[in-house]
């Protein structure tokens, strides 16, 4: 059970996990903007897989903070 209630916007109800997904997406974009210029992606075998794993890890950390 999350700390946040279901939020209703213009008659559409959004569960709390929706906002956790959006927050983790914003943090993912920031982390990715930092990692790309550093050249970390030159050492990554599969960039799409790395991005997916990074997003999943960030989402897990964000969801653990709010539960």
Curated annotation (Swiss-Prot):
InterPro entries in the cross-refs: DUF1656 (IPR012451)
Regions crossing the membrane: 3-23, 43-63
Cell location: Cell membrane
Keywords: Cell membrane, Membrane, Transmembrane, Transmembrane helix
GO cellular component: plasma membrane
Highest taxon of the lineage: Bacteria
Major localization listed first in the record, in broad terms: membrane
Keyword Transmembrane helix belongs to the record: yes
Mode of membrane association: Multi-pass membrane protein
Inducing stimuli: Positively coregulated with aaeA and aaeB by AaeR.
HAMAP family the UniProt entry points to: AaeX
UniProt similarity note: Belongs to the AaeX family.
Protein name: Protein AaeX
